[in-house]
Design a protein with these regions (language model features):
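Active-site or pore-adjacent capping/gating segments
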Residues: 212, 221-230
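Gly/Pro-rich turn-and-neighbor structural signature
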Residues: 123-197, 205
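Catalytic alpha/beta active-site cores
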Residues: 1-156, 224-228
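Acidic-glycine-rich active-site phosphate/pyrophosphate-binding loop
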Residues: 102, 187, 220
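Non-catalytic positions within long, well-ordered alpha-helices that form the structural scaffold/packing
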Residues: 11, 217-218
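Conserved, mostly hydrophobic/aromatic
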Residues: 14, 174, 220
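Active-site-adjacent loop and "lid" segments of alpha/beta metabolic enzymes
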Residues: 201-214
């Protein structure tokens, strides 16, 4: 209920997109989006767990154009060092989920916040994308491939012009890779300022850094920019 009120308040103050972090299966998405116009506001659900049964409860949300689910099993492996369950079980559930939500989501922000340079971020992200495309290449029909939405979560730092170039390069690289597998060549990019250069003790410095980072995200062509709290 608190999250819903915060989201509605943010929308009333001008927010055009909302990102919900879903920590477990007890969270009701229907209650989260009460009083929110899902036709005009983009909604992102970042699931911190893997459950095909949970996703299937919300079939009325799944096919809406501006609603995105973030489920990234390789990203979870990179972050925690473990699968949710096992390699085989995770891929089986992931396949069911992707067939339902029509979305592949890849988290590049993990690599940026871990200290990877821009070339490494793009390389690791494309490598991860290639793993997913290779897995689904034989299981999805051509028409289904074209309907899949591709979502990239990206963090940007203070290297202004290079961050702009990174986002533009990401679209070019994805286009090249997707063409090889026959997938949708358009991608949706969500950008969040990096946490790597932020301090607990000087919020004014944080504000200056996030300002330039968000500006580079806008000029780089991000679809959604989610700033960090002041």
């Amino acid at each position: 209920i608190k999250s819903n009120k915060k989201a509605v308040n943010a929308i009333e103050r001008g927010a055009e997109s909302i990102i919900f972090i879903i920590p477990n299966e007890t969270i009701s998405l229907s209650r989260l989006i009460e009083n929110i116009d899902t036709t005009s506001i983009s909604l992102y659900f970042d699931l911190q767990f893997l459950s095909d049964k949970y996703i299937l409860q919300f079939t009325d949300l799944i096919n809406k154009e501006n609603i995105f689910f973030h489920v990234d099993i390789i990203g979870n492996l990179a972050k925690n060092g473990n699968w949710f369950s096992s390699l085989q079980e995770d891929h089986h559930k992931f396949e069911t989920i992707v067939n339902q939500i029509n979305t592949l989501s890849i988290d590049l922000s993990l690599y940026q916040n871990a200290g990877a340079n821009m070339v490494q971020q793009l390389a690791y992200g494309m490598s991860q994308a290639n793993e997913y495309l290779n897995h689904f290449d034989s299981t999805l029909e051509k028409g289904k491939k074209q309907s899949i939405k591709i979502l990239f979560h990206v963090s940007v730092g203070t290297n202004y012009f290079f961050e702009i170039a990174k986002l533009k390069a990401l679209r070019i690289l994805w286009n090249t890779l997707a063409l090889e597998y026959g997938f949708n060549t358009q991608c949706h990019i969500v950008v969040i300022p990096t946490k790597r250069n932020k301090t607990l003790y000087d919020y004014n410095t944080n504000m200056l850094r996030t300002t330039t980072e968000c500006m580079s995200a806008i000029l780089g062509g991000a679809n959604t920019v989610c700033n960090l709290a002041y």
